[in-house]
A protein has these predicted regions:
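N-terminal leader/linker segments that initiate helical-solenoid repeat arrays
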Residues: 19-84, 95, 104
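Terminal, low-structured helical/coil segments at or just beyond the last alpha-helical repeat
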Residues: 31, 217, 222-256
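Short coil turns that delineate tetratricopeptide repeat
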Residues: 46, 80, 112-114, 146, ...
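Register position in tetratricopeptide repeats
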Residues: 61, 95-96, 127-128, 164, ...
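TPR alpha-solenoid repeat register
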Residues: 85, 117, 151, 158, ...
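Canonical tetratricopeptide repeat
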Residues: 88, 120, 154, 160-161, ...
Length: 256
């Protein structure tokens, strides 16, 4: 008789594979983490800010979000109107699990509407499961509207986040369209994983597995996601083969 639970050693990984109802995890939206702001944002080119910005950029590249937060707080304490610093700071708060603080940081910005501001607000809203508002913010950046001239990076970031929001709000057709566009532009393993996750939610386990197979060894969450898809399809022997060497035989049989 098939067991209806999963061993504790796999519970966190299987959460990433959608089995526990997780809404958004960092690896789900990690693709569009970036270190360079859009050219539309007002720059503060003083020597001190240039040095502080360099520290924040370097910290982002290594996911050292606490350094970004520390430096960003110092910067806006001295210059509350530094929009660029607020964007870095908001992104760091969302990445470290405090999206409400990210929105507070951005709420002090007025009279400015840029792609990056919309992207960071949407990122925080997605983390708060406010998918409808996130889609509204991102729609002008993903449907061809001329809100402003977008960089390729901003357009991909907007599409990536919008796809997450559509998927989590069960608008799978819209999510599929964006994921397919993204993968046609650039075959990115994180985007492929996110697409697989969306397909699983949609009930398309076979299609989800097809997206996961090329990235099993590239994205840590891909293997547990593949296990979830295989179990959904009743392919227990394939689960055993996939987990051989990862778990002992007894644990594998518990899982199955």
């Amino acid at each position: 008789m098939r067991r209806s639970f999963f061993p504790a050693s796999l519970s966190l990984l299987l959460c990433s594979a959608l089995l526990s109802g997780c809404v958004v995890t960092n690896d789900y939206i990690a693709f569009d983490s970036k270190a360079a702001p859009s050219p539309q944002i007002k720059r503060y080119d003083g020597n001190e800010w240039a040095s502080e910005r360099a520290v924040m950029v370097a910290a982002e590249k290594t996911n050292n979000w606490q350094t970004v937060i520390s430096v960003g707080n110092d910067v806006i304490a001295k210059n509350p109107t530094n929009v660029e610093a607020r964007i870095y700071l908001a992104r760091a708060f969302t990445k470290t699990g405090d999206p409400r603080q990210a929105l507070r940081v951005l709420s002090f910005i007025s009279g400015v509407d840029t792609a990056e501001l919309r992207i960071e607000r949407a990122r925080a809203l997605i983390a708060l499961t406010d998918f409808e508002e996130a889609v509204k913010l991102l729609k002008p950046l993903t449907d061809g509207s001329d809100l402003q001239k977008l960089s390729a990076e901003d357009r991909r970031s907007a599409k990536s986040l919008a796809a997450v929001a559509y998927s989590m709000s069960k608008n799978y057709a819209a999510a599929d369209k964006l994921y397919e566009e993204l993968l046609a532009e650039l075959d990115n393993p994180i985007i492929r994983y996110n697409y697989a996750r969306s397909l699983y939610l949609e009930g398309r386990a076979e299609d989800s597995l097809a997206q996961l197979q090329p990235i099993i060894d590239q994205v840590p969450a891909a293997k547990p996601a593949a296990v979830a898809a295989l179990m959904k399809l009743g392919r227990e022997n394939d689960v055993r083969r996939l987990l051989k060497g990862e778990l002992d035989d007894e644990k594998i049989e518990e899982l199955i």
